[in-house]
Amino acid sequence: MTELIKKGSGAKEASQFLAQATTKHKNAALLNLSNDLLIHTATLLQENEKDILRAQQKGTPETMIDRLRLTEERIKEISEAVKQVVALKDPIGEVTNMWKNEAELTIGKTRVPLGVIGIIYESRPNVTVDASVLCFKTGNAVILRGGSDAIDSNKALMSVIQDSLEASGFPRSSVQLIEDTSRETARDMMRLNRFLDVLIPRGGARLIQTVLENATVPVIETGTGNCHIYVDKAAEKQMAIDILVNAKCSRPSVCNAAETLLIHRDVAEDYLPAMETALKEYDVELRADERAKGILQEAKAATESDWEDEFLDFILAIKVVDSAEEAIDHINKYGTKHSEAIISNDYATGQAFHQKVDAAAVYINASTRFTDGFAMGFGAEIGISTQKLHARGPMGLTELTSTKYIIFGDGQIRN
């Protein structure tokens, strides 16, 4: 708790400095950080290797180790991502609306930082940089608590970040890492209302549920991604195959990867064998309902938990449905309100799907893999919010701000 109090106090003080920082000063610091990450590549890889070896010794699946791994190319990508944030418009100070009321008061609404943001996340060291940079750009101080699997990588990255920001004239406490990865410290952080203005969890269902159950700090939920592809009877066969393979296989360990295929009965016998062939190239394990299992050559029987799970692996659940309505009902029952897709050339069916499916992002004839700040065209994001208050979908710079009203008068009093 001592570490939390010390770093919380430092973050609160730094947030006052950051709120007043100019865009020019912040951008200059971020450009320096981008360069410093490249300069320290060898050290970062050396520390990351400690985490990789520890994960391998524990028998961690390779798809999860991939989330943990840093390479020279990935560090270059992280460095470039910092530059891309520099290029993004700074929302702080933006006047979103201004008007005069009946009392001749001029009322303005402007964007301001949230204050101090706490982020609890799992074994993805790139999040350490992404979260730091996004919070910094928006004038927020941030306290990070990463998973124990990535502790050596995170400590090395934090050292580079803090040294770089300090050299640019910013407090080291602008960005901080909680090095104690115990569950007790994580729970204490969830109740750090004295210093934290908001808490953002990034990780699997268990982590997010733990935060929701224990936090007294306001939470923005970045949900798990039990994403579905529904192939309608009016779907083009090759398009459906291409989208399914991309959504499932391009990077199965991320939250916007597809986990379940729903397919209309009218095209199941024709489409499923070709889909199985395409998925076999990636050694995807298929878990199918009775009707789909009768069509596929190699598939295990799906259980109830298979409809609920976010596999984050080369595993796909498959169900044959009688109608688009059944597909929608299934998604709304088992989905996590993240990203859902329909493949159909029938306009009315596509419209009904996007109107009835409850999700942050709904796709018509496109892969769910596009639920990402950069892919959507507004830059880096802190996570994908699956709740409806404050932010929903990819959370970019604007979603890390609040608003303040500024009222100009010339002596008015209220009668």
Curated annotation (Swiss-Prot):
Chemical reaction(s) catalysed: L-glutamate 5-semialdehyde + phosphate + NADP(+) = L-glutamyl 5-phosphate + NADPH + H(+)
Entry EC no(s): 1.2.1.41
A GO biological process held by the record: L-proline biosynthetic process
Primary residence: cytoplasm
Pfam family membership, one: Aldedh
Source organism, top-level taxon: Bacteria
Annotated InterPro entries: Ald_DH/histidinol_DH (IPR016161), Ald_DH_C (IPR016163), Ald_DH_N (IPR016162), Aldehyde_DH_dom (IPR015590), G-glutamylP_reductase_CS (IPR020593), Glu-5-SA_DH (IPR012134), GPR_dom (IPR000965)
Places the protein is found: Cytoplasm
Keywords, in A-Z order: Amino-acid biosynthesis, Cytoplasm, NADP, Oxidoreductase, Proline biosynthesis
Pathway: Amino-acid biosynthesis; L-proline biosynthesis; L-glutamate 5-semialdehyde from L-glutamate: step 2/2
Protein family: Belongs to the gamma-glutamyl phosphate reductase family.
Protein role: Catalyzes the NADPH-dependent reduction of L-glutamate 5-phosphate into L-glutamate 5-semialdehyde and phosphate. The product spontaneously undergoes cyclization to form 1-pyrroline-5-carboxylate.
Protein name: Gamma-glutamyl phosphate reductase
UniProt source species: Listeria monocytogenes serotype 4b (strain F2365)
Gene name per UniProt: proA
